Amino acid sequence: LVPAVQSGQVDCVIAGQSITKERQQMVDFTDPYYYASIITLVKNDGDYKDAASVEDLKGATVTSQQNTIWHDSCLPQIPDGNILPAQESAPAMLVALEAGKCDAVVTDMPTGKAACVAYPDFKLLDFTGTDGEFEVSDEDINIGISLKKGNDELKDAINGVLSEMTEDDFNKMMDEAISVQPLSES
């Protein structure tokens, strides 16, 4: 995504990108439009279906999508977790869970909700707000729109629109995106 923005192939990217210091060296970002909730997906009939905390995932074989904080920061927090290589895409990650190659995947709430629609045998586990949640920084979970460095006109225009939106507006947009997101590779 970053190379497409840098090269001018696209003007901006709205794709759940965390606003990290590393990415900010390569592209500019709008103000955050979303703060991601980290969730875990398991199979309804799997060994970890009753997990109520990260600790309860002890020993699980897990994966997530490449180039995400879910894979880089969250999976290592699972005690004795068997961390598989990062998956190329959200659909690939979900297919790994569906096929039994892993016990759980860690991702964000919108991806998790969409996955449960595409895969009814998945269960969404949300440890947010409990003592057993994944430990992340605000930088890890603040989501913004990336654009080419120095494109202040576009950045200001997007920030102007974002500043007028309410939490309900954002939630409605997220729900609409979830309803049309093609997460199944079948």
What is each PLM-predicted segment?
Residues 1-186:
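Proline/Glycine/Serine-rich low-complexity intrinsically disordered segments
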